[in-house]
Structure formats: C-alpha cells, structure tokens
C-alpha cells in the first residue's frame, strides 16, 4: 500500500516536471540538450513519458517547491522581492535608483510675468497669508515689482465699461475706466517726458565773442534752430577778448596792416578804413566778384539765344526786361554791343 502511494506520487511529480521541461525546451532550444537527457526515476519502461532536462532554472525550482509543499500540506513559498521585480517587465533595474531623485510636484514651477506685481488681498486685510513665502502676490510695498506695460496701455477708453457700466476685467483692464486712471497715466508720462534740451555751441570764424555767444544762446532755445549768429564787424572781431595777444602771436595783424595787404589785390583806395570795404554788402561792390569778359563767340551765341527766345514769345505779350534786375555781366555785355 505504501509502495503504491509512493510510486503514484513520483509519477505525478515526474509528469509535472516533464511538462515544465517541455516549455523550457521550446523557449531555449540548444544543440547539446539531448546529451543531457536522462530517464526519469520510477517511470514505467514502456510508458513513453517525455524526458526531463537535467539543468533547472529558478522558475523550475519554484514549481518543484510548490508541488512538494502542496503534497506535504505546507503553504507555497512566494518569490523573493528581487525575483518578482525582475519578472515584472514594467520595472527596470535602474528604476530603484531613479525613485528618490524624482521631483516633487510643484517644486519646479515657473513664476509668471505678473509675479509679485499686485498686493496680496488677504495679507492687506488680515495681516497674514496662509501661503506665506510661496504666495504669488506681494506682501507689502517692499515686495511689489513694476510691470512692463504696452506703450498704448491706458491710452483709450474702455468701450465695455463706458457702454454698460461694467467691465469683467476690473482693475486689470488695459483701457481707461475713469478720470483717475487717466490722471495717473498723464502724470507718469510728464515725468518721463522732461528731458534736458540739446545744447549747441557756435563759433563765428573760429573766434567767438561775448556778443556772438549771447546771440547764439538766444537763438538756440529750440534745438532745431539752425539760424547763424549775426555777422559782426571786423572791429568787433579784432577787439574780441578771445583773440590772441598781438605781442605773443606773430600772425596777429592790425587794421592798417590788413589794408596794406589787401589794397593792391582789390584795388582799394589809399585812404579810409579797410574794414568798411571788407565788410560791405555785395550789392555795393558788384565788380569785386565779376567774371572775366566772355570771348566773341560767346557773345554771338548769346545774341542767337535772345533772338530765338523773342521769336518764341511772338504770339503772346513779350516780357519786358528790367535793367536793374540784370546781372552786372549782362549789363557790361550790352554796353560793349552798343
């Protein structure tokens, strides 16, 4: 009786082991596996039961232990934590090292552009805020930050507010709701608009005098003024305190020396002050800048031009030429023709 029970138990055990070995052979086939096959102990000779593999893996050991424990009535041993961890495909080996380094939620949040740009209402009303240092609003004037606004911020009236009397954006609206916002914006612009005026300096002929400096400062009230200072006489220039002293400067000349230098080239008379001639208007000395007389061929061309222009205006009233408005060169040419 005892022998029958033992043989039946061995038979069941060998059958389970053979089934497990079949699965292992299908998953990991090897060329030398047939050499390691052996007959199961206690199996019938002609039964034709499949053979088992002698090399066992941890999974087959687990099945054997589970079978033996079921026969003895003991609870089946569970897989160790390491074995179960590797049997789970969703868990990687490096996952255990990555778990402690995971970021806590909310630790790496990025502050918005409106961070600390408004006062915290609970802190202003109650003097305390449940968020503490993590609050996105300013706890006092010292934490309040300035917000960069658009250039057209608060420059136009809010249509919604002035149409229905209510704006859903409230104080955050970018348009004007009342006169106080307009006044506050205008005050801020006035402070930014005050800038120092651009100052220029003029030096007339390289020698600025006191009168020229006073005239230049009076004319430069507006930075766009480019009106030059009034022309001064030579006596003012020669008597300017900024001119170098004649005793120390070898290139300083008196009015008489200037007259002696320019008289031969300009045909100045012997008497009179040379400064009166040097600073006369051009209308009083027209021959000073006259060009040399033109040759005879240019005269003929000029006469042909006058004849053609007079014939072109034959159909209409011929214009009358005013001799006083003609240039000196043409008046001389007309005299030479006569």
UniProtKB/Swiss-Prot annotation:
SUPFAM superfamilies listed in its UniProt record: CCCH zinc finger
Signal peptide bounds: none
Statement: the UniProt record of this protein carries the keyword Kinase: no
Post-translational modification: Phosphorylated. Phosphorylated by RPS6KA1 at Ser-334 upon phorbol 12-myristate 13-acetate (PMA) treatment; this phosphorylation results in dissociation of the CCR4-NOT deadenylase complex and induces p38 MAPK-mediated stabilization of the low-density lipoprotein receptor LDLR mRNA. Phosphorylated by protein kinase AKT1 at Ser-92 and Ser-203 in response to insulin; these phosphorylations stabilize ZFP36L1, increase the association with 14-3-3 proteins and mediate ARE-containing mRNA stabilization. AKT1-mediated phosphorylation at Ser-92 does not impair ARE-containing RNA-binding. Ubiquitinated. Ubiquitination leads to proteasomal degradation, a process inhibited by phosphorylations at Ser-90, Ser-92 and Ser-203.
Compartments in which it is found: Nucleus; Cytoplasm; Cytoplasmic granule; Cytoplasm, P-body
Record bears the keyword RNA-binding: yes
Region: Necessary and sufficient for the association with mRNA decay enzymes and mRNA decay activation, residue numbers: 1-111
Zn finger limits (C3H1-type): 114-142, 152-180
Record's compositionally biased regions (Low complexity): 305-318
Keyword vocabulary terms for this entry: Cytoplasm, Developmental protein, DNA-binding, Metal-binding, mRNA processing, mRNA transport, Nucleus, Phosphoprotein, Repeat, Ribonucleoprotein, RNA-binding, Transport, Ubl conjugation, Zinc, Zinc-finger
Annotated region (Necessary for mRNA decay activation), positions in chain: 185-338
Residue spans of biased composition, Polar residues class: 101-113
Molecular function GO labels: 14-3-3 protein binding; DNA binding; mRNA 3'-UTR AU-rich region binding; mRNA binding; zinc ion binding
A GO BP entry: positive regulation of monocyte differentiation
PTM annotation (Phosphoserine): residues: 54, 90, 92, 203, 318, 334
GO cellular component, one term: ribonucleoprotein complex
SMART domains: ZnF_C3H1
Region of interest (Disordered), ranges: 93-113, 273-338
Subunit details: Associates with the cytoplasmic CCR4-NOT deadenylase and RNA exosome complexes to trigger ARE-containing mRNA deadenylation and decay processes. Interacts with CNOT1. Interacts (via N-terminus) with CNOT6. Interacts with CNOT7; this interaction is inhibited in response to phorbol 12-myristate 13-acetate (PMA) treatment in a p38 MAPK-dependent manner. Interacts with DCP1A. Interacts (via N-terminus) with DCP2. Interacts (via N-terminus) with EXOSC2. Interacts with XRN1. Interacts (via phosphorylated form) with YWHAB; this interaction occurs in a protein kinase AKT1-dependent manner.
Functional note: Zinc-finger RNA-binding protein that destabilizes several cytoplasmic AU-rich element (ARE)-containing mRNA transcripts by promoting their poly(A) tail removal or deadenylation, and hence provide a mechanism for attenuating protein synthesis. Acts as a 3'-untranslated region (UTR) ARE mRNA-binding adapter protein to communicate signaling events to the mRNA decay machinery. Functions by recruiting the CCR4-NOT deadenylase complex and components of the cytoplasmic RNA decay machinery to the bound ARE-containing mRNAs, and hence promotes ARE-mediated mRNA deadenylation and decay processes.
PANTHER family: CCCH ZINC FINGER/TIS11-RELATED (PTHR12547), MRNA DECAY ACTIVATOR PROTEIN ZFP36L1 (PTHR12547:SF53)
Protein name per the record: mRNA decay activator protein ZFP36L1
Gene from which the chain derives: Zfp36l1
